[in-house]
Swiss-Prot record:
InterPro entries: Ribosomal_bL17, Ribosomal_bL17_CS, Ribosomal_bL17_sf
Organism: Orientia tsutsugamushi (strain Boryong)
Pfam family, one: Ribosomal_L17
GO cellular component: cytosolic large ribosomal subunit
Name of protein: Large ribosomal subunit protein bL17
Subunit structure: Part of the 50S ribosomal subunit. Contacts protein L32.
One MF term in the entry's GO annotations: structural constituent of ribosome
One GO BP annotation of this record: translation
UniProt keywords, alphabetically: Ribonucleoprotein, Ribosomal protein
Protein family (similarity comment): Belongs to the bacterial ribosomal protein bL17 family.
PROSITE patterns: RIBOSOMAL_L17 (PS01167)
NCBIfam families membership: L17
């Protein structure tokens, strides 16, 4: 019996599933739109929406929680500085899923998962800028030592 069992297994172990969700959420935060299978998109949406809700708090505890979940400080920085202020007035519903037909090889249902109210022209430029800033700070720290 499946009583009180929530979520999808997606034919993965728990650690594999959590790693996949973390990697997909970093990609979604970076590009603000990704193409994946429909079951993965349906599983990813509540994961990322909870991250945005935590990022809206904006304190140190929230930052540490986000780093523990997605393990990418640059993505956490974009969550805290760009996405949290963008959705400050919105209470949930930060992400939409658009069905995108079927994949040729195995006819798996595909979907686009994207942020609502996203800037279509940016295409990950903010993420690259944050990444370059982090890289420059690291180089400066190495040169000072």
């Amino acid at each position: 019996m499946r009583h009180r069992v929530s979520g999808r297994k997606l034919n993965r172990t728990t650690s594999h599933l959590l790693a996949m969700l973390a990697n997909m959420s970093v990609s979604l935060i970076q590009h603000e739109q990704i193409n994946t299978t429909l079951p993965k998109a349906k599983e990813l949406r509540p994961f990322v929406e909870k991250l945005i809700t935590v990022a809206k708090k904006g304190n140190l505890n929230a930052r540490r929680y986000l780093i523990s979940k997605i393990k990418n400080e640059i993505a956490v920085e974009k969550l805290m500085t760009t996405l949290a202020p963008r959705y400050a007035e919105r209470h949930g519903g930060y992400i939409r899923i658009l069905k995108a037909g079927f994949r040729y090889g195995d006819m798996a249902p595909m979907a686009y998962i994207e942020f609502v109210d996203r800037n279509i022209e940016s295409k990950g430029k903010e993420f690259k800028a944050l990444k370059n800033d982090a890289r420059n700070a690291k180089l400066i720290a190495e040169q000072s030592n």
